[in-house]
Amino acid sequence: MGLYQLLKPALFQLDAETAHGLGHRVLDGIQGTPLERIVADYCTVVDPRLRVDAFGQTFPNPVGVAAGFDKNAEIPDALGALGFGHVEVGGVTAEPQAGNPRPRMFRLAEDRALINRMGFNNDGADIVGERLAATDCRVPVGVNIGKSKSAANDDAEADYQYTYERVADGGDYFVVNVSSPNTPGLRELQSRDRLESILGTLQDDGASPLLVKLSPDLTDAAIEDAIEVVEDLGLDGIIATNTTTKRPASLHSDAADEEGGLSGAPITDESTDIVRFIAKRTDKPIVGVGGIDDAESAYEKIRNGASVVQLYTGLVYEGPTIARDINRGLLKLLERDGFASVEDAVGVDI
């Protein structure tokens, strides 16, 4: 049993957001110190078979940190040192936001899940942009861009554009987030016309590589519309998926009825199904997100069409060596199945 598993019972006595903040402070304390290099040497799996080239980026391995863990771009270097192949910061909004009242993050320990209703709490595009510009991360850094709560949907294009222009110099790729369930009216921007307008505005402003993050709660027809927008505009990829507002009957935890987006093990199969659905309809690279907490769940996303994957909830339950453990496991799975690289395994189950 590793150190994190020994500490986890004590950490889980804390409020979920408080525990997250504690972990964040530890990583912030490591970042930029000699200890960061020691951590990187311990956690990083270096093997050319893990390398993935997708949407103009070279990822040293396919396992990334999903948006939400480092909302303000404060610890991307430290997260990279944990062995992740990329880090996505944000969601970042044009204006600073306090987010929703606490408590707003809940563990569903029996279900290996989280529910959050954070509400895009962040320092705002001006401050986050300055941090990103000063960042020299060892892995690609993506920037997840959300809409300010104060901005009407009719003003969404200008709001997203303001944020993009402030973070443009510090991001390696950019993600339009229209799928968080915790900003009123945001998911309405997933309609074809609104999505096309927002993405087109950012493209015209030079945003590249540009991806869109979709909800798992969309209908098949709505997903197909989004794919058509991605194809028509020549976008670089799709992230599938965000959290869900659905509550599977299988949930057992007391917090299951809390309002917000559900992530973790209960959405594994649904998110994989959506990855496969998208991969059957487009050759655009897909970032698979949802319920990844070990090599097998990451491999399943990859075999169903994901070029790279991301996790957040898995980090809460498995601890800071999760990227190392997944990458080691992926190498064994590739050897077992006769693949020369991760890229060779992408989409083989479609």
Swiss-Prot record:
Pathway per the UniProt entry: Pyrimidine metabolism; UMP biosynthesis via de novo pathway; orotate from (S)-dihydroorotate (quinone route): step 1/1
Cofactor binding note from Swiss-Prot or TrEMBL: Binds 1 FMN per subunit.
Active site: 180
One Gene Ontology term of the molecular function aspect: dihydroorotate dehydrogenase (quinone) activity
Cited CDD domains: DHOD_2_like (cd04738)
Entry annotated with the keyword Signal: no
InterPro entries on file: Aldolase_TIM, DHO_dehydrogenase, Dihydroorotate_DH_1_2, Dihydroorotate_DH_2, Dihydroorotate_DH_cat, Dihydroorotate_DH_CS
Subunit structure: Monomer.
Protein name: Dihydroorotate dehydrogenase (quinone)
Organism (species): Natronomonas pharaonis (strain ATCC 35678 / DSM 2160 / CIP 103997 / JCM 8858 / NBRC 14720 / NCIMB 2260 / Gabara)
Lineage: Archaea, Methanobacteriati, Methanobacteriota, Stenosarchaea group, Halobacteria
